């Protein structure tokens, strides 16, 4: 579930990068009241969150999309029966006259927690997406990745694949923002 993926603190959780890229918040209820917390502030490490004892997420809140906004989440998995991402990337873009005016990029399964990749997003700002920009973006995502090696993939493999997946996600988000499906 959306909330289950968030609350287990896994860096490979599929829904978390997309929620963060979209600017989602959650409503958290505790004995001291209700608070609205950004999804990106919940995960703090593998299997760890900043939720306290007795705090319960009661709602996921997604902001309204703008007309020229698009997003995408892509992941790589080794086979369908092992449904845990080796790498994942979510991209949210807003356009003004085809030029990227805002960007948020979130990498999953390539570090101890889901990571907001601000330097990768910054290389997209003020640009129309083309192969040159996509190449720079892909390289930046690979550079920012800090994966481990495990049975699902080596560190080197994950660094390479996150660049490919990020490039595809950026293209898909850009096309969506342009109104293309």
Language model regions located:
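C-terminal structural segment of proteins
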Residues: 1-181
